[in-house]
């Protein structure tokens, strides 16, 4: 068995590098590398794991542009018929109903849309994340697409404004895990808290060694390699990301 990972981009989300990509303490060091705070579009990636007995998807990506702009980060971009997860799967020869398992790094809005299209899939997330997603502090209502934020008769799924993972026919298929767990041979998950309370990382064993689908634990490669000056002055060996609920957990992750 030879597992492969295929990246599928579900759209683009605007972010400010010095506020989002990097912790504020990194500012003067990454600026010397040419990083500015000018808004930049980050791709919102999902990952298709092929080659095993079951077809596995890591996250399902963001919502359509209008919803993303109104409730989350604007100006976002999801090109209809191109970037949504159903279209991305079609481009590589699959339908959502072909997917056997969807693993969620976490349950933020930009990782969980269009779940109703995956009619045969098992849905798996971390137990802590599932619990928190249903009872977040108000600061995170938008992140978890809680119905209390709905405006103007807007809907997210069918005819109601609801977190996609709470839809009838979807919620019943969710399973939760905790700790380090093998999902199928060659694919395992472990807890990588910090960005949110119940974030998890997916590890895929390939012919070239293990690959890690890290969700939002790492935004850019600059997060994992601190400039030498930062190492000398701050004793950092990483440039931690700027978006987190627990910086200690994020660092240890």
Across the structure, where does each feature detected by a protein language model lie?
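Short glycine/proline- and acidic residue-enriched helix-loop micro-motifs
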Residues: 32-33, 69, 151-160, 232-242
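Active-site flanking residues adjacent to catalytic metal/cofactor-binding acidic residues
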Residues: 58, 105, 125-126, 194, ...
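Core dinuclear metal-dependent hydrolase active-site scaffold
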Residues: 4-7, 46-50, 56, 65, ...
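Metallo-beta-lactamase
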Residues: 1-94, 98-110, 117, 122-191, 209-216, ...
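Cap/insert and terminal regions of metallo-dependent hydrolase folds
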Residues: 75-87, 208-253
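Catalytic metal-binding/acid-base residues of hydrolase active sites
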Residues: 61-63, 108, 129, 193, ...
């Amino acid at each position: 068995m030879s597992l492969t990972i295929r990246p599928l981009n579900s759209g683009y989300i605007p972010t400010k590098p010095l506020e989002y990509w990097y912790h504020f303490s990194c500012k003067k060091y990454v600026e010397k590398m040419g990083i500015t705070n000018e808004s930049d579009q980050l791709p919102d990636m999902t990952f298709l794991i092929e080659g095993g007995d079951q077809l596995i998807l890591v996250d399902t990506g963001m919502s359509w542009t209008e919803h993303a702009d109104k409730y989350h980060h604007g100006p976002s971009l999801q090109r209809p018929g191109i970037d949504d997860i159903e279209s991305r799967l079609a481009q590589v020869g699959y339908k959502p109903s072909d997917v056997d398992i969807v693993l969620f790094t976490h349950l933020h809005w930009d990782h969980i849309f269009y779940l109703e299209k995956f009619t045969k899939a098992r849905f798996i997330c971390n137990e802590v994340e599932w619990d928190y997603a249903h009872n977040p502090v108000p600061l995170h209502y938008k992140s978890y697409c809680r119905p209390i934020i709905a405006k103007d008769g807007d809907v997210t799924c069918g005819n109601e404004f609801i977190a996609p993972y709470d839809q009838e026919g979807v919620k019943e298929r969710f399973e939760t895990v905790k700790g380090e767990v093998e999902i199928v041979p060659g694919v395992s998950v472990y807890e990588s808290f910090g960005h949110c309370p119940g974030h998890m990382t997916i590890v895929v064993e390939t012919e070239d060694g293990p690959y890690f689908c890290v969700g939002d634990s790492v935004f850019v490669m600059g997060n994992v390699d601190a400039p030498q000056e930062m190492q000398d002055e701050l004793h950092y060996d990483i440039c931690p990301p700027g978006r987190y609920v627990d910086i200690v957990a994020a660092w240890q992750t």
